[in-house]
Amino acid sequence: FKNLNFNEQSLILQGDATVSSTGRLTNVVDNGEPRTSSLGRAFYSAPIWDKPTGRLASWREKIQEPNKAGPADGMAFALVPVGSEPKDKGAGLLGLFDEYDSNRHPVAVEFDTCYNLEHDPKERHSIRSIATPRWDFPNGENAEVLITYDEELQLLVASLVYPGERPYYLPSDRVEIEDELPEYVIPGFSATRGLNEGETHDVLSWSFASKMPDEQESEGLDLAE
């Protein structure tokens, strides 16, 4: 299955997220400028985990994300429960978390354009990160991202590269996702922007493939290419 543009029928759009005529999934902007205090989320509508069997699908994501203005606050690839709604609009919470607590949270990989030790130290079971490599992005350039999860190894790996540039950024960690998430989850993106900083968060293309441990990998789903 392929789409040349993002297919709204296969996506759950929340908050300020829109599908534009250029095939980009973006936060809403006013008069061409990034909107302040903005939150947008978009998720694929089909769940990827069948808890009764104890099996989790593997996935791959390829994202291209430009940064056209000053840094803040970032966007994240996330797995959220089916029926999840946008959370606290505080920009540092990425639209995925209600507050800094130790309750069960989504599993997310954040592309943080505003490095802040208060929000970015290593710590499990919270908004705080379990792996935090620095990301010195060239402003306005497109980044390509690959995210993989191996259910057998319980290993989550994310890599980011600008074409023709180095280095790769390779955070990884062992995550027992079946212990962190409920029975049904959906994959997608969430992005926020604060009151003062200015940037937009665009997903230019997104491909998705998954398989159960005992099955052959699916051909793949290009939600936009």
UniProtKB/Swiss-Prot annotation:
Record-linked InterPro entries: ConA-like_dom_sf, L-lectin, Lectin_legB_Mn/Ca_BS, Legume_lectin_dom, Leguminous_Lectin
Among Pfam families, the record links this protein to:
Lectin_legB
- What does the UniProt keyword field contain? Lectin
Q: Tell me a Gene Ontology molecular-function term this record carries.
A: carbohydrate binding
Q: Does the keyword 4Fe-4S apply?
A: no
- Transmembrane segment boundaries: none
**Entry's family note:** Belongs to the leguminous lectin family.
Provide the function of this protein.
Answer: Chitin-binding lectin. Agglutinates rabbit erythrocytes, but not human erythrocytes.
Q: Report quaternary structure and partners.
A: Homotetramer.
Name of the protein: Lectin
